[in-house]
Amino acid sequence: MAISRLIINHFRNLTAIDLEFERGFNFIIGNNGSGKTSLLEAIFYLGHGRSFKSAVANRIISYQQPHFILHGKIQEQQHQWSVGLQKQRQGNTLMKINGEDAKKISDLAHLLPMQLITPEGLTLLNGGPSYRRAYLDWGLFHHNASFYNAWSSLNRLLKQRNSALQQVCSYEKLKIWDRELTKLAYQVSYWREAYAEALRSEIEKTCQLFLPELEISVSFHQGWDKNMDYADLLQQNFERDRALGYTFSGPQKADFRFKANGLPVEDILSRGQLKLLMCALRLAQGEHLMQQKKRHCIFLLDDFASELDQYKRTLLAERLQKNGSQVFVTAITREQLQQIQPEKHRTFYLENGRIKDL
């Protein structure tokens, strides 16, 4: 999977840009504030229907413009797609795939599997469980065709149950939700645990490359006591849930935890080590997708040199070259990218939202 062409109109300070990309490495160089991260953000938005920096569309649309437009050409082996997305200030989103209206963001996301590595991405390790659930759910979305519908139904039922908790006074009135909720909770949890286990060896192998001085272990927690029947737990905790106004236990509390030498990674690793572990997790997941589904991820790396010494940069660059994916890398200077010497690459220079091909 690769983006061969990208047109951007009125996305932050990127007013009118039309770029053709290399299937391998694409280097984006420029000073702070030049628009490097905005270019990665636009690529990410095209594949997710949202930003990794801001949830407010008005902050992304260029000043005094009614909307932004993204249009991309995507190639995978013998297939080609044309995708477009327009976001209006009023909040409306228009999407097209090969000229036809796309109804769901998931249609775009399926076409463009992406791995994002940014300085803020350490939340995967030191943030709340929701970041690690998203990590597992991303993988399941691309591996299991049935997962998205089950996951969506589960979230819808949880919202309905939480709303009902604030209105009912007896558990009997919740049973209609809990029968289906229990079934979906077990299904989603089973898939998550199986996927986490399938990833384990790939994660351990990649961590050994980047952090050989540490023994990294992973563990999945489904969100409630494995010795408890979930239906019984929902009934047993009804009064507590009603007092809280939401469902306390369940797959919405699941976590995928990481330890280094037996201790939580967020407690003992330096920022540089955390970044290496985050890179290892993203690479392991992308390579697992390639092995299982023969699909390449697109890797987006913002501020390549941040937190990494020269040797670790070289390791990361070599691993990215080896997996054969399309890669977008930002840096302030060319010297920060000297560890990456791919055969196929393009270099772009950004200044005040304007770009040129070097």
Swiss-Prot record:
Source organism superkingdom: Bacteria
Pfam family name, one: SMC_N
GO MF terms, alphabetically ordered: ATP binding; single-stranded DNA binding
SUPFAM superfamilies documented for this protein: P-loop containing nucleoside triphosphate hydrolases
PROSITE patterns in UniProt: RECF_1, RECF_2
Annotated GO CC locations: cytoplasm
Binding-site list for ATP: 30-37
Keyword Signal: no
GO BP of this protein: DNA replication; DNA synthesis involved in DNA repair; double-strand break repair; SOS response
Primary location class: cytoplasm
Gene3D superfamilies: P-loop containing nucleotide triphosphate hydrolases, RecF/RecN/SMC, N-terminal domain
Keywords (A to Z) from UniProt: ATP-binding, Cytoplasm, DNA damage, DNA repair, DNA replication, DNA-binding, Nucleotide-binding, SOS response
Compartments where found: Cytoplasm
Entry's family note: Belongs to the RecF family.
Its biological purpose: The RecF protein is involved in DNA metabolism; it is required for DNA replication and normal SOS inducibility. RecF binds preferentially to single-stranded, linear DNA. It also seems to bind ATP.
The protein's name in its UniProt record: DNA replication and repair protein RecF
Organism, scientific name: Histophilus somni (strain 2336)
Gene: recF
